[in-house]
A protein has these predicted regions:
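Long, C-terminal-biased catalytic regions of enzyme "large/alpha" subunits
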Residues: 1-174
Length: 174
């Protein structure tokens, strides 16, 4: 599935991370989907499950279909993608630990599988911080990935975050 964030924003006018209305509604939606799967399973003797997957190319297609059907709705269909499964929207300011804690409750309601991601800066010189995030993942969430910015130049051997400066189209590295 995809678009829980946008669903809640459309139905409640808030993000699914908003604790008073957003999160409870999002959890109810997820429980409803799980209950529907159980009902279909009983009726058909075929197993159904909710799969919280990253759907990068599909979220673009879904967004285009929603835009065509419903038009542009601010905060819902105004981008060329919808948010993966239960994920916190990329524009929301949230630290890695809070993001993992928030998303863990939705992984429990995604029995077909789920993955969360946290983006962190280049941490190759801060291994204790990496281990701290990894331990938090191990202790608090079913499945998560830690994405860090680290680049390697095959020409000069530089290992770290490479930034490109657009200086008159030079593509100069700094």
């Amino acid at each position: 599935y995809a678009g829980l964030c946008e669903c809640v924003r459309y139905m409640k006018g808030v993000s699914h991370t908003e604790p008073k209305e957003g999160t409870p509604f999002a959890l109810k939606v997820m429980q409803y989907l799980n209950d529907a799967c159980e009902q279909w399973k009983k009726e058909s003797n075929i197993d159904f499950s909710i799969y919280g997957t990253p759907l990068e190319s599909t979220t673009y297609k879904f967004a285009k279909c929603l835009q065509k059907r419903f038009g542009i709705i601010e905060g819902v269909t105004d981008k060329n993608y919808i948010t993966n499964s239960y994920h916190v929207h990329v524009t929301e300011q949230i630290n890695a630990f809070d993001k993992l804690k928030f998303e863990s409750q939705f992984q429990k309601l995604s029995p077909g599988g789920a993955i969360s991601y946290v983006e962190v800066p280049n941490m190759q010189d801060n291994i204790p911080a990496v281990l701290s995030v990894m331990q938090y993942i191990y202790d608090n969430i079913m499945y998560a990935e830690l994405n860090t910015q680290s680049d390697y130049c095959q020409v000069c051997g530089y290992d770290g975050e490479i930034k490109i400066v657009e200086e008159e189209g030079s593509g100069k590295l700094i």
